[in-house]
């Protein structure tokens, strides 16, 4: 039986840390679905639309065997169940991530006990990278090429130059 995993996230934007986890998970799972959240949590203000995040993820991950990129707009466990997955993959950058991730894993186990959450840590050179930090550096004109794949760096440069420097695409500067 094939082992199917789901790696959920906002991926706004997809970073080298995300790509590293996906690449390494290809050795662990027969199929990995990178599940891009259609509706990020209310505390997040995405720089990229869902379609942009999907396109960037698909471009970056296109050569990785067994990897698919899909949007989801439901409860994660419902998406996982519908895809026949038995694993939820989560990344842990630091000890500070653990408490929140542990809570999510515990809740998911209550909702769908036949699915396990597997945590992977990024390679050391990616441990400090987060999408929010990358967005902040890019918005302030910094060089993000060490933190994201080239296609993402170009998209960030376009997003944070000109009239939409605030990144939300409305041109209102805030």
From Swiss-Prot:
The keyword ATP-binding applies. It catalyses: (R)-4'-phosphopantetheine + ATP + H(+) = 3'-dephospho-CoA + diphosphate. InterPro entries: Cyt_trans-like, PPAT, Rossmann-like_a/b/a_fold. Pathway: Cofactor biosynthesis; coenzyme A biosynthesis; CoA from (R)-pantothenate: step 4/5. Its main location: cytoplasm. Pfam families: CTP_transf_like. One of its GO terms (cellular component) is cytoplasm. Its EC number is 2.7.7.3. It comes from the Bacteria. GO terms for biological process: coenzyme A biosynthetic process. It is an enzyme of class 2 (transferase). The keyword Transferase applies. Substrate binds at residues 10, 44, 76, 90. ATP binds at residues 10-11, 18, 91-93, 101, 126-132. The record marks 18 as: Transition state stabilizer. Keywords: ATP-binding, Coenzyme A biosynthesis, Cytoplasm, Magnesium, Nucleotide-binding, Nucleotidyltransferase, Transferase. It is found in: Cytoplasm. GO terms for molecular function: ATP binding; pantetheine-phosphate adenylyltransferase activity. Reversibly transfers an adenylyl group from ATP to 4'-phosphopantetheine, yielding dephospho-CoA (dPCoA) and pyrophosphate. Homohexamer. Belongs to the bacterial CoaD family. This is Phosphopantetheine adenylyltransferase. It comes from Alkalilimnicola ehrlichii (strain ATCC BAA-1101 / DSM 17681 / MLHE-1).
